[in-house]
């Protein structure tokens, strides 16, 4: 049976004189094969008392399982993002059921942004931009160009990057959810 797939998630971290800005956004399209099943899915969430932002790309049911597991790790480790991410990937790699999950997470708090994969990777981007999912490459390119050539906020860059990805990627729509810290 085919799984629900297709999305774009982008996160931008930007330094300003007032401090770091971070935002994560995602589109709302869910596809089953080549059919759009839903256009208003919320793939970006606030976790751990609103202090952590998370977005997922991949199989929808798998991603919700990972959200729950990740939030439990955040609670266990008092909101320490990197520690919770490493502990989640350890479980993801060693648990027979979790190992079959097909999803990626983009997570961020006030100081750190990470990509968490089912391969056991916990990656911190060098430039503060994370982009995952089918339209990720388009959104990442747009975000990098906007960071280098504008004074837009992190949230504005995320919104514009998602819009650009939505114009190019057939698995990305224009219904966006964006959260910022």
From Swiss-Prot:
<keyword id="KW-0378">Hydrolase</keyword>
<dbReference type="GO" id="GO:0009376">
    <property type="term" value="C:HslUV protease complex"/>
</dbReference>
<protein>
    <recommendedName>
        <fullName>ATP-dependent protease subunit HslV</fullName>
        <ecNumber>3.4.25.2</ecNumber>
    </recommendedName>
</protein>
<keyword id="KW-0915">Sodium</keyword>
<keyword id="KW-0645">Protease</keyword>
<dbReference type="InterPro" id="IPR029055">
    <property type="entry name" value="Ntn_hydrolases_N"/>
</dbReference>
<keyword id="KW-0021">Allosteric enzyme</keyword>
<dbReference type="InterPro" id="IPR001353">
    <property type="entry name" value="Proteasome_sua/b"/>
</dbReference>
<comment type="subunit">
    <text>A double ring-shaped homohexamer of HslV is capped on each side by a ring-shaped HslU homohexamer. The assembly of the HslU/HslV complex is dependent on binding of ATP.</text>
</comment>
<keyword id="KW-0888">Threonine protease</keyword>
<dbReference type="InterPro" id="IPR023333">
    <property type="entry name" value="Proteasome_suB-type"/>
</dbReference>
<feature type="binding site">
    <location>
        <position position="166"/>
    </location>
    <ligand>
        <name>Na(+)</name>
    </ligand>
</feature>
<comment type="similarity">
    <text>Belongs to the peptidase T1B family. HslV subfamily.</text>
</comment>
<dbReference type="GO" id="GO:0051603">
    <property type="term" value="P:proteolysis involved in protein catabolic process"/>
</dbReference>
<feature type="active site">
    <location>
        <position position="7"/>
    </location>
</feature>
<dbReference type="GO" id="GO:0005839">
    <property type="term" value="C:proteasome core complex"/>
</dbReference>
<keyword id="KW-0963">Cytoplasm</keyword>
<feature type="binding site">
    <location>
        <position position="172"/>
    </location>
    <ligand>
        <name>Na(+)</name>
    </ligand>
</feature>
<feature type="binding site">
    <location>
        <position position="169"/>
    </location>
    <ligand>
        <name>Na(+)</name>
    </ligand>
</feature>
<comment type="function">
    <text>Protease subunit of a proteasome-like degradation complex believed to be a general protein degrading machinery.</text>
</comment>
<dbReference type="InterPro" id="IPR022281">
    <property type="entry name" value="ATP-dep_Prtase_HsIV_su"/>
</dbReference>
<dbReference type="Pfam" id="PF00227">
    <property type="entry name" value="Proteasome"/>
</dbReference>
<keyword id="KW-0479">Metal-binding</keyword>
<dbReference type="GO" id="GO:0004298">
    <property type="term" value="F:threonine-type endopeptidase activity"/>
</dbReference>
<dbReference type="GO" id="GO:0046872">
    <property type="term" value="F:metal ion binding"/>
</dbReference>
């Amino acid at each position: 049976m085919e799984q629900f797939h297709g999305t774009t998630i982008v996160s931008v971290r930007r330094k300003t004189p007032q401090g770091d800005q971070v935002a994560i956004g995602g589109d709302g399209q869910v596809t089953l094969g080549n059919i759009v099943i839903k256009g208003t899915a919320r793939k970006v969430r606030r976790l751990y008392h609103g202090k952590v932002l998370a977005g997922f790309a991949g199989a929808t049911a798998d991603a919700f399982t990972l959200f729950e597991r990740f939030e439990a790790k955040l609670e266990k480790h008092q909101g320490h993002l990197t520690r919770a991410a490493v502990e989640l990937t350890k479980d993801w790699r060693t648990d027979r059921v979790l190992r079959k999950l097909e999803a990626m997470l983009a997570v961020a708090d006030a100081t750190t942004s990470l990509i968490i994969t089912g391969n056991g990777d916990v990656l911190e981007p060098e430039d503060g931009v994370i982009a995952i999912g089918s339209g990720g490459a388009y959104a990442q390119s747009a975000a990098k160009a906007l960071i280098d050539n504008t004074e837009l906020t992190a949230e504005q860059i995320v919104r514009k990057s998602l819009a650009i990805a939505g114009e190019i990627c057939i698995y990305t729509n224009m219904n966006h959810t964006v959260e910022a810290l």
